[in-house]
Amino acid sequence: TKSCYLKELGINAIELQPIQQFDSRSPEEYHWGYMPINFFSPSSDYASSPQKAAQEFNSLIDAFHHAGISVIIDVVYNHYGIPNHLLNIDRELYLSTDHLGRLTNFSGCGNDLQCEAEPVKKLVLDSLKYWVENFEVDGFRFDLGELLGFELLSEIEDELKKIYPNIILFAEPWSFRGRLPAKMNQTGFALWSDRSRENLLSIV
């Protein structure tokens, strides 16, 4: 309701950790949803039954919106979980490799997506549009945004603003490969600041 506890705290937006269907082989391997295996479906792990995942996620979004709270979801488009369908479909097309043909590991997960490839760009864009158009998600936080790169992130902003001009976008500006260029500051993206984080930790 509009008098919900979160609203009474002054909260006007919430961010959900990854809720796209993820790899969950055993409780011991739990990783908070950061091993996606389907970019187009809400995780059945959070639903009362697999068949109701989309319906119940829609109800969740509607409830937050009714209370005046925007919903941002954390998305992971830099690597893939197990089973790795993209690896099995076309390893060289979807996954990044080095000069010896080995999978690169700048995500720390062993199978970076090749975000410069047009099919990967289309997959990411189609997925994001799906979440906005079908679930009315208000924004996205991009895990290890550096691996998506400036070009793809800029295209994401352009395409999503055509659908929802007030879309909220922010990203981690780093990966184990490096950092996003300073020109990201001229885009509509907000960026996580590791410097602010470390400064805060130093005084807590």
Regions found by a protein language model. Give the residues of each.
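Short, solvent-exposed turn/loop segments enriched in Gly/Ser/Thr/Pro and often Arg
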Residues: L16-S26, V75-N84, L144-G149, E172-F176
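Conserved, mostly hydrophobic/aromatic
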Residues: L6, L16, F39, F64, ...
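Short, well-ordered coil/turn segments that N-cap beta-strands
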Residues: G10-N12, A67-I69, D74, E136-D138, ...
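Surface-exposed amphipathic alpha-helices with a cationic face
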Residues: C4-K7, N58-A67, E157-K162
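Glycine- and acidic
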Residues: L113, V137-F142
